Amino acid sequence: MDFFSIGTNDLTQYTMAVDRGNENVAYLYSVFHPSVLRIIKYIIENAKKAGIEAGMCGEAAGNPCMIPLLLSFGLDEFSVSPSNVLETRKNIASWSIRESDEVTTSVMAMCTEKEVANYLSDYIAAKEQRSGCASQTRRTNPLLLQGQSHLLRKQGGYDGSDL
């Protein structure tokens, strides 16, 4: 196996046993549910142990609230829609390793989707207010955009120098 690609839309739907197209239960669908986050972390950690790259496609890959978690988990590739590439690159570049690890430690101790989503939303709002822009916390290596695939690939880390 050369790589793992985590499809968060289906993973979340099947983990939560929720049809996101069914208005009676769609409100239960959330990638921020601790069960879904633990599965994502487990997949990425085990891919790393096996020497296999882990990528992610689906809405979560470009979600600003998910980015610190995915960086801390060690995600190698973010596959996002073309309209989200620039914003996702900027968001990735705004997180230091230390800060994303701290946020992830807090989140992984939480028990509910609401708790996780509120914490991440509040943290990111406060971070943006403190910095005024995303350029103050950078990673250490360049973020590369590969051709037209809209695949953001980590090469050792991120610093956003190619933005």
Question: Each predicted region: which residue ranges?
Answer:
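Non-catalytic helical/linker scaffolds that mediate oligomerization, partner binding
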Residues: 1-133
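N-terminal polybasic/positive-inside topogenic patches
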Residues: 134-139, 150, 157, 162
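Generic detector of N-terminal low-structure segments
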Residues: 146-147, 153
